[in-house]
Amino acid sequence: MKITQLTTYRVPPRWMFLRIETDEGLIGWGEPVVEGHARAVQAAVHELEPYLIGQDPARINDLWQVMYRAGFYRGGAVFMSAIAGVDQALWDIKGKALGVPVYQLLGGLVRDRMRTYGWVGGDRPADVIDGIRQRVDAGFTHFKLNGCEELGIIDSSRAVDAAVARVAQIRAAFGNTVEFGLDFHGRVSVAMAAVLIKELEYLRPLFIEEPVLAEQAEHYPKLAAKTHLPLAAGERMYSRFEFKRVLAAGGIAILQPDLSHAGGISECLKIAAMAEAHDVAIAPHCPLGPIALASCLHVDYVSWNATLQEQGMGMHYNRGGEVLDYVLNPQDFRLDNGFIAPFTKPGLGVEINEALVLERSRDCPDWRNPVWRHADGSVAEW
């Protein structure tokens, strides 16, 4: 079997799908994208074509190493996301060729279902209580929300009090019948993260995500030493080599690799194993589409230390396209009290509605995250 063609489709709301075709008619799908930089990833995918066309898609490990090493320069969000989408599609082809789900190729199940969580509240968290009630009615017990709005490098007690009051309302309304993570989204400086975490600790959120930006990772162990709350990070780390340094330094209790950013299934399986060796959980990052979610779940199903799976159904970003819009088998993503059962179809288990993908890709707007500014006019972290 040989790879014959790579085709990319940018689709709403902010995703990109990759279709890899073979000379035997088997098709594999991947989801290579960096939100807000889809065109850059699209170009990177097609720059990889000379390493892929005419090659055997079953040689996933070799093709991954060629893509990563042959071009000399490597790493970063755009390049590793391009590799990630190709890798997902190659696993999809291999599973289809052998007639088994990808998790069987990775050694088989370690669990019978995977707990997922949904988002509430939006970019600037609002209507959180109503959002949680809707999720509870749908059977969820675990959620995530942004822990704060934009914060200055040193900010006011009022901003801290507002963030704490929001979380206190959740505990007052629901007690400990729900669990929630708080995403600082890299909006918070080291100094303000220490203040916020201390003030929030008594409310016992499940974890604090991206307490500071990944480029400030040397502060993770310092922040962890000041709290009993688990710290989570990883969505803006792109290879096992970046995760290696974070694991060695300590401080992070939950790694959150993104299967569409951090080299795909092949790389994230290694990251999960590295995390397990350090007694660290994984909870893959996935505010994306169905192929990314399926890829995450296959890693979750075979990784003992997978604890939670983010999923973007009903997420505030999904204007113009929902996670299951593009699939012909939405029943296989059915949520049962927040859990998703292992897929039974071969490959990734996602049947893509190619006609709809083609239609919506013809006039897909470019998605950009908003540019926020502080009161003094300086740019704020989103």
From Swiss-Prot:
Its cofactor is Mg(2+). It comes from the Bacteria. Transmembrane segments: none annotated. One of its GO terms (molecular function) is magnesium ion binding. The record marks 258 as: Increases basicity of active site His. Its EC number is 4.2.1.6. The active site is at 185 (proton donor), 285 (proton acceptor). CDD domains: D-galactonate_dehydratase. One of its GO terms (biological process) is D-galactonate catabolic process. Binds 1 Mg(2+) ion per subunit. The keyword Transferase does not apply. Pathway: Carbohydrate acid metabolism; D-galactonate degradation; D-glyceraldehyde 3-phosphate and pyruvate from D-galactonate: step 1/3. Mg(2+) binds at residues 183, 209, 235. SMART domains: MR_MLE. The record marks 310 as: Transition state stabilizer. The keyword Ion transport does not apply. It catalyses: D-galactonate = 2-dehydro-3-deoxy-D-galactonate + H2O. InterPro entries: DgoD-like (IPR034593), Enolase-like_C_sf (IPR036849), Enolase-like_N (IPR029017), Enolase_C-like (IPR029065), Galactonate_deHydtase (IPR023592), Mandel_Rmase/mucon_lact_enz_CS (IPR018110), Mandelate_racemase_C (IPR013342), Mandelate_racemase_N_dom (IPR013341). PROSITE patterns: MR_MLE_1, MR_MLE_2. Keywords: Lyase, Magnesium, Metal-binding. Reaction proceeds via an anti dehydration. Belongs to the mandelate racemase/muconate lactonizing enzyme family. GalD subfamily. HAMAP family: Galacton_dehydrat. PANTHER family: D-GALACTONATE DEHYDRATASE (PTHR48080:SF2), D-GALACTONATE DEHYDRATASE-RELATED (PTHR48080). Catalyzes the dehydration of D-galactonate to 2-keto-3-deoxy-D-galactonate. This is D-galactonate dehydratase.
